[in-house]
Every structure is written in structure tokens, then in C-alpha cells.
């Protein structure tokens, strides 16, 4: 029974940390250490799982529960696991315990009262029949374990949008720009900071002037560089240093704000001949020419085109 509970706990904890909360823990450690240390998902999941299992062994050595209440010795490590992955979706620059600052001590007090009660009456429990996987004792304890796992799922961070956003942050931070852009395309909603990382990623792969508007963009020129928005992982200085002298960033800023008159004045300095202008620059220049003549392109506008972005709801 003890071995079965340990296996179930370790498998759940490792899978939960490695497959579901890995990106969240990367962000948590980054903020907690002020960017001085980096969380490695596979190694971190193994180490945290081992530490939590050792915590359970320590708790059981004190309580010495061996019957129906044995699985209760897993509550302290389950509580630690929950708090570790309960980072707020509104986090910006630092980690706070929030409600857990008072809720965790309260739960531990209630836990101590419960286990003392269980320990007091454990000698009087009737023997449970069955051995191995047909043992009633095993399934009672596994039921308690599953209730604990449900507790983890309910009170840790399970915000889908936040998970998607942090995944993009981690991929960009690790220079996996193509993967980040694929993740962004799968997001149902994007915010201004994700838009900034979208522009940065497209620029890093060299397609700012021919594929940027295939992605959802919000915020206009304000999200081009850090200022009003910031990345959770990537320092502002990294983005600014990589883009401060970029002609494409300057022209893209005009296009994001739909400022075609200013765009046309600058684009002719860098691309005087229409035939050498990249896709969006040529399209925007032609669009400006039509608009100055009082003409408007007929909808529908092709998705991924600058014209579609220009006439989209502002």
C-alpha cells in the first residue's frame, strides 16, 4: 500500500510539473531570483518530486499512520506543490504569497487536528480484508490521494491564457522564435505584451516586412518596444538593443499606427523603387496612393495582408 501510494504520488507530481507547469515554474524562479537563476524543467521536476516525497517520509516518521489514514501524510507535500504552482496570473516583477500567507497556516492547523484524531483512533480500526490491488485499504488511501490531486488542480494556476502567454515568453527567451510564433497562432486571445514578442520574433527571423500581419496584433506603435508594455522574462535592454537601429522597426511603427503619410515619406528614402519594396511596404504604398485619390479597395481583404489590418476594427 505504501509503495503504491508513493508511485502514484511521484508519477503525478513529475507529470504535473514537467508537462503542465514547467513554463510557470520557469517564470516563478526567474522572478523569485530576479533573473539570476534559471529553472530547468526536466531536472527541476525530478528534484521537486524527490524533495516532496522525502517530505512525506518525514511527516510519516512523526505521525506513524499505517492504515486508512496513511495517505493523509501526503497533505503537507501536496500543499507545498500547490503553493509552488499557484503564481498569480497578474504577476509582473515579483512573487507574492497572496492568500496563501494566511490560508496555508490555517490548513496546516486543521490538518494537525485531523491527523491527531485519526492517529488516536487508528488502533481501534477493524482489519480490512484483501491484499494487493483488491485491498480495500489500498483503494481508501488512493481515494484520498486522488482528492489531494484534485485540490492541486483546483487551487494552483490553471489559467489557460496565462499558460499560453508564459509559454511564448519562455520560447522567445530561449531563442526559439519559430516555435513561439506557432504557439502565438494557436492563441485565441493576445495582449499587448504578446504582440510585442510577436513583432520581436518575426523580426528575429527576418520576416517583419512580409509576414507580420499574419498574426493578431493589438496596441499599435505603443507595443513595438518596451515602454508601456514589458516582457515577463526578456529584459527590456535585450529588445531595445536588437531593434534600436532597425529600419524595419521604424517603418513597422508607422504601419501599426496606420500612419501612411509618414510611412510613405520614409519608405521612399530606403526603397525608392517600388519593385524592390518588400510585400507590406509595396502594399501600404499602393494603399496610400488609393486613399489620397479618394478611393478605397473593395472588401473582403485577404487575411494576412496589410490592407486587412488597416481596415480592421481599431
How would you name each of these model-derived features?
Residues 13-19, 76-87, 146-152:
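Aromatic-anchored segments of alpha-helical transmembrane domains
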Residues 241-314:
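Solvent-exposed soluble domains appended to multi-pass membrane proteins
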Residues 110-112, 213, 217-234, 291-314:
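Intrinsically disordered, low-complexity, charge-biased linker/tail regions
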Residues 71-128:
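Membrane-embedded alpha-helical segments of integral membrane proteins
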Residues 157-264:
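Soluble catalytic regions of membrane-associated enzymes that act on cell-envelope
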Residues 1-76:
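Membrane-anchoring hydrophobic segments
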Residues 31-32, 64-68, 120-135:
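Membrane-interfacial, low-structure loops and terminal tails that flank and connect transmembrane helices
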Residues 132-159:
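Internal/C-terminal transmembrane anchor helices
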Amino acid at each position: 500500500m505504501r509503495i503504491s501510494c508513493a508511485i502514484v504520488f511521484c508519477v503525478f507530481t513529475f507529470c504535473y510539473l514537467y508537462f503542465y507547469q514547467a513554463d510557470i515554474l520557469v517564470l516563478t524562479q526567474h522572478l523569485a531570483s530576479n533573473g539570476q537563476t534559471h529553472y530547468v524543467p526536466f531536472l527541476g521536476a525530478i528534484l521537486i518530486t524527490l524533495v516532496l516525497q522525502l517530505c512525506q517520509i518525514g511527516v510519516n516518521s512523526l505521525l506513524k499512520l499505517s492504515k486508512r489514514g496513511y495517505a493523509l501524510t501526503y497533505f503537507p507535500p501536496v500543499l507545498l506543490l500547490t503553493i509552488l504552482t499557484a503564481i498569480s496570473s497578474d504577476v509582473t516583477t515579483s512573487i507574492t504569497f497572496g492568500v496563501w500567507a494566511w490560508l496555508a497556516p490555517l490548513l496546516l492547523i486543521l490538518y494537525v487536528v485531523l491527523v491527531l484524531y485519526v492517529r488516536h483512533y487508528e488502533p481501534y480500526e477493524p482489519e480490512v480484508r484483501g491484499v494487493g490491488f483488491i485491498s480495500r485499504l489500498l483503494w481508501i488511501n488512493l481515494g484520498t490521494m486522488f482528492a489531494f490531486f484534485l485540490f492541486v488542480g483546483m487551487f494552483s494556476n490553471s489559467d489557460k491564457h496565462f499558460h499560453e502567454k508564459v509559454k511564448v515568453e519562455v520560447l522567445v527567451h530561449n531563442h526559439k522564435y519559430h516555435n513561439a510564433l506557432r504557439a502565438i497562432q494557436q492563441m485565441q486571445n493576445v495582449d499587448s505584451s504578446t504582440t510585442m514578442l510577436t513583432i520581436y520574433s518575426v523580426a528575429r527571423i527576418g520576416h517583419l516586412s512580409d509576414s507580420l500581419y499574419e498574426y493578431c496584433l493589438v496596441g499599435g506603435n505603443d507595443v513595438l518596444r518596451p515602454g508601456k508594455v514589458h516582457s515577463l522574462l526578456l529584459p527590456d535592454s535585450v529588445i531595445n538593443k536588437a531593434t534600436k537601429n532597425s529600419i524595419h522597426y521604424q517603418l513597422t511603427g508607422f504601419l501599426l499606427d496606420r500612419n501612411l503619410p509618414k510611412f510613405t515619406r520614409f519608405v521612399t528614402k530606403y526603397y525608392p523603387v517600388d519593385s524592390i519594396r518588400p510585400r507590406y511596404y509595396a502594399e501600404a504604398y499602393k494603399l496610400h496612393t488609393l486613399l489620397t485619390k479618394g478611393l478605397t479597395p473593395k472588401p473582403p481583404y485577404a487575411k494576412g495582408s496589410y490592407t486587412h489590418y488597416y481596415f480592421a476594427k481599431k
